[in-house]
């Protein structure tokens, strides 16, 4: 019942609803945890002959444990793809409260502990690949290492007055399976709360424990004790910190809808060489400018005439002629604006002759883009 209850508690914590992005570790991290340790009944073989290492033909009993506690610390490295490697040191403790069967009824008391190290390989499961965007990362892992089992002087007092004591320290190969989940603590990048279940197994002990029997308070014999597999079921809460975790990205900037394009406020009307009359295309452009003046806030319309620097008589005479030509072009555009409904008083005209060319040229050069009138809405 205790095992089922602890498993349910771990599952519920891992499934708690949350909302944010989960952390996949890249780089170094540290991990600490502690919790509940439940040791399965452990089978021991005993011999009263200290020289006889074969236990299979001698007596045997099972030792039963009360619930204890466990703790671990680990340092590791995450590869950014869910895979992690870590080195771990761990400690387990439990009380021994029963031994059976025995030759006579009795009461057993004592405790044992195990400690050592593991190398673990773990994998973090990114839930986003399944369309689940929460700050929880489930993980699974396996580990292997070496554990020492220390049995304190564990005493069995029989109803007939005899006493047996078991004690010693021996080590052996150990392994573990891990399943759990990590929750990203809000506003603390890299820090996670972890909940996990571990099954820690120890296949054998590399040497015997000491078994001493007493009768009427006097040591009667000293022998060996060997233990079979040892299994720990552990339910652990902990904290993990990843050092290279960047803070979460800022929320996306609100989408700014660009304003609707405003009508052009400058219009260009082009002329043939040495001409001031409007072409059909020029009349269309003037009409667009006249219509735009009614849709935007306009206080006045400036009409500026220009020429290129070509002339039949280059020099001052040509410059004077071009100045007059630029004014006539501006007057032609003004007259067309008035026909299109623009009030006369809103129009100012200027002639600049060869000044302010759109396209710089050499002297006495015919350039179509410089033969123009600019309509500017103010």
UniProtKB/Swiss-Prot annotation:
Protein keywords: Cell outer membrane, Lipoprotein, Membrane, Signal
Highest taxon of source: Bacteria
Function comment: Growth enhancer.
Alphabetical list of InterPro entries matching this protein: Bact_OuterMem_StrucFunc (IPR050330), Msp4_OMP-like (IPR002566), OMP/PagP_b-brl (IPR011250), OmpA-like (IPR006665), OmpA-like_sf (IPR036737)
Domain OmpA-like: 258-378
One GO CC annotation: cell outer membrane
Identification of the protein by name: Outer membrane protein
Signal sequence, start to end: 1-22
Protein species of origin: Gluconacetobacter diazotrophicus (strain ATCC 49037 / DSM 5601 / CCUG 37298 / CIP 103539 / LMG 7603 / PAl5)
Subcellular localization: Cell outer membrane
Induction info: By cellobiose.
Pfam families xref list: OmpA, Surface_Ag_2
Predominant location: membrane
């Amino acid at each position: 019942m205790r095992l089922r209850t602890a498993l349910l508690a771990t599952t519920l914590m891992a499934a708690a609803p949350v909302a944010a992005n989960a952390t996949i570790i890249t780089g170094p991290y540290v991990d600490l945890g502690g919790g509940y340790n439940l040791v399965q009944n452990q089978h021991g073989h005993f011999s009263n002959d200290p020289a006889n290492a074969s236990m299979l033909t001698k007596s045997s009993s099972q030792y039963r444990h009360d619930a204890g506690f466990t703790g671990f610390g680990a340092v590791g490295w995450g590869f950014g793809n869910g895979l992690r490697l870590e080195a771990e040191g761990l400690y387990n403790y439990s009380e021994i409260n029963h031994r059976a069967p025995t030759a006579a009824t009795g009461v057993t008391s004592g405790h044992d502990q195990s400690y050592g190290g593991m190398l673990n390989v773990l994998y973090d499961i990114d839930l986003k690949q399944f369309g689940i965007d929460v700050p929880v990362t489930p993980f699974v892992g396996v580990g292997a290492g070496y554990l020492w089992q220390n049995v304190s002087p564990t005493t069995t007092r029989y109803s007939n007055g005899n006493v047996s004591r078991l004690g010693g320290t021996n080590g052996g190969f150990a392994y573990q399976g891990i399943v759990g989940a990590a929750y990203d603590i809000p506003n603390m990048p890299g820090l996670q709360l972890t909940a996990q279940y571990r099954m820690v197994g120890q296949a054998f002990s590399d040497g015997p424990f000491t078994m001493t029997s007493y009768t009427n308070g006097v040591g009667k014999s000293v022998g060996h004790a060997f233990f079979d597999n040892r299994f720990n079921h552990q339910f652990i809460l902990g904290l993990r910190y990843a050092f290279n975790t960047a803070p979460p990205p800022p929320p996306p900037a609100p989408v700014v809808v660009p304003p609707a394009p405003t009508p052009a406020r400058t219009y260009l009307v082009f002329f043939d060489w040495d001409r001031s009359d409007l072409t059909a295309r020029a009349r269309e452009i003037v009409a667009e400018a006249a219509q735009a003046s009614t849709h935007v806030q306009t206080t006045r319309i400036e009409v500026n005439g220009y020429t290129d620097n070509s002339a039949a008589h280059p020099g001052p005479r040509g410059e004077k002629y071009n100045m007059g030509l630029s004014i006539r072009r501006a007057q032609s555009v003004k007259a067309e604006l008035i026909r299109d409904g623009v009030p006369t008083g809103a129009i100012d005209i200027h002639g600049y002759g060869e000044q302010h060319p759109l396209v710089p040229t050499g002297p006495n050069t015919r350039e179509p883009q410089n033969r123009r009138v600019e309509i500017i809405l103010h």
